[in-house]
């Protein structure tokens, strides 16, 4: 019997719960939200697809009753506010830090051994906050961003190669932001062959650029942030934990000397299994990639420093 809680029944949270159910990742999924009735309604809607889609996962929606989340193996935290017009970055970080910190504390009260997957934005900063505020072992706090960015990278590669995205391997490291992520074009492969052998350097560079603005492109088309791929990416991380798949998934992890950095939570390739982050994979970066990673780390550290400036940490 396995149990996953998804905090926040917005588009991303509900999609995550739906994917977890349809893929039969866990025997029970709890969807919890602060707004009366929303989680219950979305859970009921998901459950009414069980016969149509052939799953037996029980999805339960609750309003702000964290006792219902007791015994969760994995908790996905999607709660937080989007940035509103006129709101400063510091104000947004302050508001979301308060929400994430409160949620994480309540979760641990009822599920002291849970592994936490952080989706709330700014994601690298919220993962850092969760790790620092709760004092958990670093393997138990995972930022989801790289899983999503890497999926988008593989999508754009597959479009350029005119193939199925499942035939492509590729990943993104660095911060979860359109100026801080680093699509690792040098390591991208199609059926084991370097993609750089199949398309031009200019085409590969365009794929990287498309990946970096992938989120913004969708926001422009949808009029709001995307939710299908983000929800599925969070579910994929939870799946690798629950079923001990030991997949290599780029995630935001707290570094203790890896890549030459300390006291930063940033996207790196991780082996994800039943213990959460079981290993951080250190890639042999060339000088250009090291420079990009250094710039990304500096930008993420600057955002993360706001937590101390506003007194949250």
Feature roles, as predicted:
Residues 9-10:
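Glycine-rich Rossmann-fold phosphate-binding loop(s) that bind the pyrophosphate
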Residues 88-154:
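Rossmann-like NAD(P)(H) cofactor-binding subdomain of soluble oxidoreductases
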Residues 13-14:
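N-terminal Rossmann-fold NAD(P) dinucleotide-binding loop
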Residues 1-4:
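Extreme N-terminal starter segment of soluble prokaryotic enzymes
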């Amino acid at each position: 019997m396995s149990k996953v809680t998804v905090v926040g029944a917005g588009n991303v949270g509900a999609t995550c719960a739906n994917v977890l159910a349809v893929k039969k990742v866990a025997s029970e999924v709890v969807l919890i939200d602060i707004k009366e009735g929303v989680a219950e309604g979305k859970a009921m809607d998901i459950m009414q697809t069980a016969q149509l889609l052939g799953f037996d996962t029980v999805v339960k929606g609750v309003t702000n009753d964290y006792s219902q989340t007791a015994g969760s193996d994995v908790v996905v935290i999607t709660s937080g506010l989007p940035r509103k017009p006129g709101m400063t970055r510091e104000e947004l970080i302050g508001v979301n830090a308060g929400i994430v910190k409160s949620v994480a504390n309540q979760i641990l009260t009822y599920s002291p051994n849970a592994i936490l997957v952080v989706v709330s934005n700014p994601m690298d900063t919220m993962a850092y906050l969760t790790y620092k505020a709760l004092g958990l072992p670093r393997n138990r706090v995972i930022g989801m961003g790289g899983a999503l960015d890497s999926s988008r990278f593989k999508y754009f590669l597959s479009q350029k190669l005119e193939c199925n995205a499942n035939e492509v391997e590729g990943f993104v490291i660095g911060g979860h932001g359109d100026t801080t992520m680093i699509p690792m074009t040098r390591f991208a492969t199609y059926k084991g062959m370097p993609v750089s052998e199949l398309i031009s350097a200019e085409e590969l560079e365009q794929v990287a650029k498309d990946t970096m603005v992938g989120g913004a492109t969708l926001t422009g088309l949808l009029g709001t942030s995307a939710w299908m791929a983000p929800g599925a990416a969070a579910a994929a991380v939870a799946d690798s934990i629950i079923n001990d798949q030991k997949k290599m998934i780029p995630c935001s992890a707290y570094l203790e000397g890896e890549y030459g950095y300390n006291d930063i939570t940033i996207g790196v390739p991780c082996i994800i299994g039943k213990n959460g982050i079981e290993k951080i994979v250190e890639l042999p970066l060339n000088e250009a990639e090291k420079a990009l990673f250094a710039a990304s780390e500096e930008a993420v550290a600057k955002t993360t420093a706001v937590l101390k400036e506003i007194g949250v940490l």
